[in-house]
Amino acid sequence: MEKNVKKEAWLHFCVSSIGGFMGAYAIINHCDLLASSQTSNMIHIVHNLFEPEHSLLIYMVLAALVYACGNVTYVLLHKFIKLDTKIISLGLTSVAFILVSVLNFVENSYLAMLPLFFAAPIQWNDYAGDAGYGSSTIFSTNNIRQTVTSLTSYLIDGDIKMKRKAQFFGMTLLFFHIGVALASVAEIFWARESIWLGFLPLAVSAVCCMWYKEVKVFSFGKKSEALESIVEEQVNI
């Protein structure tokens, strides 16, 4: 069991590099638009209601709806598809990268980023409870909080569980920003076409996923109730 948890943790770290790449690519190449999150978009929606010009409002709402559809799709996949959803998530992300490359000619950044608005929440949901921790692979706020609070608790109390928790969230942050660095360097040379470099962390994650699953594509069991309870307690948005 311990070995499997370690494998799941490494899978989580690798997938976090995809999340970092997606977030950085969107921000750098599409007017600071973060396709991995809806916080800024929802703020812009409300703010736009009080502006005299509403030309972008429909695109903002569309982005929010597509993001919501990504969450709905995750639930449907999780409940009705026998294939392992972690693998499906990576497949959908690869399709999203291809669609983004096609839509790059569109001047409207909201339209160009719609595939990432859809794929990001599916990845988030699929990898949120890895190794028993409620950690997101697509943005960093909660991961920073968990790293700092866990490390502080460990330094005060010497609790080894807090040390392991800080290590997990810290490694997630490290790999996330490896993805950010990849997107940043790629943009220098290929601008918007740098989306194709996203297949590098995707390929690494796919190999890690197969290693974790021991090359079994079909899922034959569920997480233990104990692990589910841990995830339920720690997942926060």
Protein language model annotation of sequence segments:
Residues E2-I237:
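Alpha-helical transmembrane segments of multi-pass membrane proteins
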